[in-house]
């Protein structure tokens, strides 16, 4: 990673004082995840070495943020909010539908995520995606989709399967 992304890494490190390299952990992890598909143990050690922190500190960051993964995930990551406002507006039934549509086990989805047999999608149930007034909602990769119906979910999945989805803003 250091050799391939040396320019990007130097640019990131230049944003922080020399004695505060640990501040670069998040952007360095983003590079690692882009390169390997998830934050591998080797990538975590490499980020730790660059940021001059212990690997356990970097691993804790990976474990804290829902957009960093410590295990292989599908091409697209689908995160369904399960927090109280979304639950009150049907996220549990929505998650049932999503599991059925993608053919994954709900228990796995609720305990770390489940990936489809073809490797296209990983479905996760997560706590709060910060759009409580627009429930039920989900995030696919980095894009939010709000006030979704099961039919709209099915359409989105088909668009992502066929690469016909173009990013759009949901209001």
Task: Label every PLM stretch briefly.
Residues 1-171:
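Signature of N-terminal electron-transfer/Fe-S-associated modules in redox systems
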């Amino acid at each position: 990673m250091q050799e391939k992304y040396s320019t990007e890494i130097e640019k990131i490190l230049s944003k922080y004082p020399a004695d505060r390299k640990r501040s670069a952990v998040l952007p360095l992890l983003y590079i690692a995840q882009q390169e390997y598909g998830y934050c591998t143990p080797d990538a975590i050690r490499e980020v730790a070495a660059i940021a001059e922190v212990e690997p356990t500190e970097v691993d804790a960051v990976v474990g804290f943020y829902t957009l960093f993964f410590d295990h292989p995930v599908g091409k697209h990551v689908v995160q369904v909010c399960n927090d109280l406002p979304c639950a009150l507006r049907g996220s549990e039934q929505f998650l049932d539908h999503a599991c059925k549509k993608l053919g994954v086990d709900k228990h796995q989805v609720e305990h770390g995520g489940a990936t489809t047999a073809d490797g296209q999608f990983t479905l996760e149930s997560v706590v709060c995606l910060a759009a409580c007034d627009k429930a039920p909602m989900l995030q696919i990769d980095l894009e939010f989709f709000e006030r979704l119906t099961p039919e709209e979910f099915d359409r989105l999945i088909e668009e992502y399967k066929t690469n016909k989805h173009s990013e759009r803003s949901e209001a």
